[in-house]
Amino acid sequence: MAGRELSHLQQLEAESIQIIREVAAEFDNPVMLYSIGKDSSVMLHLARKAFYPGKIPFPLLHVDTGWKFKEMIAFRDAQAKKFGFELLTHINPEGLAQGINPFDHGSAKHTDIMKTQGLKQALNQYGFDAAFGGARRDEEKSRAKERVYSFRDRHHRWDPKNQRPELWRTYNGAVNKGESIRVFPLSNWTELDIWQYIYQENIELVPLYFAAKRQVVERGGQLIMADDERMKLAEGEQFKEELVRFRTLGCYPLTAAMHSEADSLEKIIEEMLLTRSSERQGRLIDSDQSASMEQKKRQGYF
C-alpha cells in the first residue's frame, strides 16, 4: 500500500515536532521563549503535540518589559492555567528600578535593557543551554541567514560567520559549558503558513490580532494604541477611534496597528494573500538602523 503523502502544513508540522523532540532529548536544560504572539502560540501548540499525552517537559519563559498590552498578559496567564505548563516570567530589575521606558529613553535603549539584557539575565539565572524561539526566516533578512540551531557564545552573542552546517536536517548541538543554542523550529514557515495552521488547528490567539474599533493616535505615519494611562501625547496629537488590528505584537508604545476589516481567521488569511508589505513594518524597533535586528542578535537578542 502506498504511503500517505503529507500536505505542506503537515510536512512543516512534522519537521518542527522533530526539532522540538530532538532538543528535549539532546540538551540538559531547555526552555521555550514565550512572547505570547501568534508564532509563540503555534510553537506552544506544536510542543503540546510533540509530547502528548504527557506534559511539555520544559518550562516556558516570558521576558516581560512592563509595557506589553494588557490583553497579552491576560492571555498568557489564561493559557498557562488552561494547559498547565510551567511558566517563568522575568523582568530586568535594574531596568525597572531605573524606570526605563520607551517614551523617555527611546526604543533602542528600552529594547536593549528590558528585552536583550533581561533575556540574558533569565538564561543565566536558570542555566538554560537551549532556548526555543519562534523566529521565521521570512520575517527579516538577518533571520533569513540564521540556522535552525543558532550557536551563542558564553555572552549569548550570535556571530553570523560562525554557524554550523545543517545538512539533511542533521543538527549539531554540541556546546561547551556556558555556551548555548537558540533553536527555531518555525524557521521554514512563512507568515501565511502560520495563519493557515492556526485556522486548521483552531489555535487561540490574543484578540488584538483581529480587527476592532480601537483608540489610536497617529505618530510618524503609524497608528499607536493607548493601552493605559502611561501613554504620552505630543503637542497637537489626539486619539481617534479606528477599525484596526495588529499584525505583530510587542511593547504597546512601539507596536503600530494597521487599518483592517479582518475580524476573523478567514479574513486575515485573505488579507495575507493580497498584502505586499512587511510583517514587521509595525515594529518601531526595526526602524532604527543603528539598532538593526542583526546588531541586536549579535548582542544577545532573541
From Swiss-Prot:
Signal peptide: none annotated. Pfam families: PAPS_reduct. It catalyses: sulfate + ATP + H(+) = adenosine 5'-phosphosulfate + diphosphate. GO terms for biological process: hydrogen sulfide biosynthetic process; sulfate assimilation. Keywords: ATP-binding, Nucleotide-binding, Nucleotidyltransferase, Transferase. NCBIfam families: CysD, PRK05253.1, PRK12563.1. With CysN forms the ATP sulfurylase (ATPS) that catalyzes the adenylation of sulfate producing adenosine 5'-phosphosulfate (APS) and diphosphate, the first enzymatic step in sulfur assimilation pathway. APS synthesis involves the formation of a high-energy phosphoric-sulfuric acid anhydride bond driven by GTP hydrolysis by CysN coupled to ATP hydrolysis by CysD. PANTHER family: SULFATE ADENYLYLTRANSFERASE SUBUNIT 2 (PTHR43196:SF1). This is Sulfate adenylyltransferase subunit 2. It comes from Shewanella baltica (strain OS223).
